[in-house]
């Protein structure tokens, strides 16, 4: 189980990058609470 305090995780191909390693979303825990998908924004809509 990976723990991460960041409120933003970038998903790529069904996995998130955590410390440079792609892992499955189901293995991510945010502050002791299992991560849930809050909002998905296509990369094309991101603003720099």
Curated annotation (Swiss-Prot):
Which InterPro entries did the record assign? Arteri_GP5
Q: Which GO terms describe its cellular component?
A: viral envelope
Organism superkingdom: Viruses
Matches recorded under Pfam families: Arteri_Gl (PF00951)
Q: What is this protein called?
A: Uncharacterized protein in VpX 5'region
From which organism does this entry originate? Lactate dehydrogenase-elevating virus
């Amino acid at each position: 189980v990976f723990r991460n305090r960041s409120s933003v995780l970038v998903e790529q191909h069904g996995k998130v990058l955590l410390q440079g390693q792609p892992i499955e979303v189901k293995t991510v825990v945010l502050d002791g609470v299992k991560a849930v998908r809050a909002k998905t924004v296509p990369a094309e809509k991101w603003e720099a």
